[in-house]
Amino acid sequence: MEQSSGAVIRSYAKINLFLDVTKKRDDGYHEILSLFQNISLYDRLIITKIDRGLEIKTNVDIENNILYKTWDVFSSNFKEPEFGLRIVLEKNIPMQAGLGGGSSNAAALLFYLSDQLKIPKNKIIKIAAKIGSDVPFFLIGGTAVVKGKGEIIEPLPPLLGYYVKLITANGISTKEAYNLLNSTLFNKAPCSPYALYEAYYHRNIDEIKRCTYNIFEKVIAKQNREIAQNIKKLKKNSIVSTLTGSGSAVYGISFREGDFNFVPRGVEYEEINI
């Protein structure tokens, strides 16, 4: 039997304005130094309460949906909810594109559960990294420097007035992309993510061009001609263009035109009556 309350949550995509890898750890994970930025492309989760369990309906075929893992991690770290959920997931964010769609969905569910069960956000952030390395960022959202495996978040004042064009392609998996890196490529960025943030904040085009960096761009472009062509195509009408994450999406930034814009949030929550 369904309950009467529910929510509609927008879970926003992200791009990496800056992405470097600083080292490979003994446990096999890589540590990053990045500048994350949410954009106005979003998935929508329509959540209603049911008696028990988790039911997910979606408009795309997703194997091993991260929402199941999110529910399990939440239940094992906190008291299992005395209610179940039915989630209708409307996917608009391309998958396996470096846009963080799955992590954003996970953060949206964590946000809902923490709100319903009155769990402080700082406790939710601590378990978020167990679900995925980008999930902690989406619980904070907006503009942030991200370090470590993704669990160290430094929020920054929002960057507004920028527009984004995206092109997706057939890419390679994140694991394969990291396997293309070696330690000689680490820490080779021309400046820091903080310097790039200041350039965006002050609309300094020359510095934006100088400081924009993605460690994966050269190695992925060598492997994937389509991605290399997409980067070149977007550069014609953009301040800068590069990969987000390890791809396959490529973005271009401009002041006046684009399909999406920067937004100061990771998720947007609205309670509804069903």
UniProtKB/Swiss-Prot annotation:
ATP binds at residues 94-104. One of its GO terms (molecular function) is ATP binding. The keyword Transferase applies. The keyword Lipid metabolism does not apply. Pfam families: GHMP_kinases_C (PF08544), GHMP_kinases_N (PF00288). NCBIfam families: ispE (TIGR00154). Belongs to the GHMP kinase family. IspE subfamily. This is 4-diphosphocytidyl-2-C-methyl-D-erythritol kinase. It comes from Thermosipho melanesiensis (strain DSM 12029 / CIP 104789 / BI429). The lineage of its organism: Bacteria, Thermotogati, Thermotogota, Thermotogae, Thermotogales. The gene is ispE.
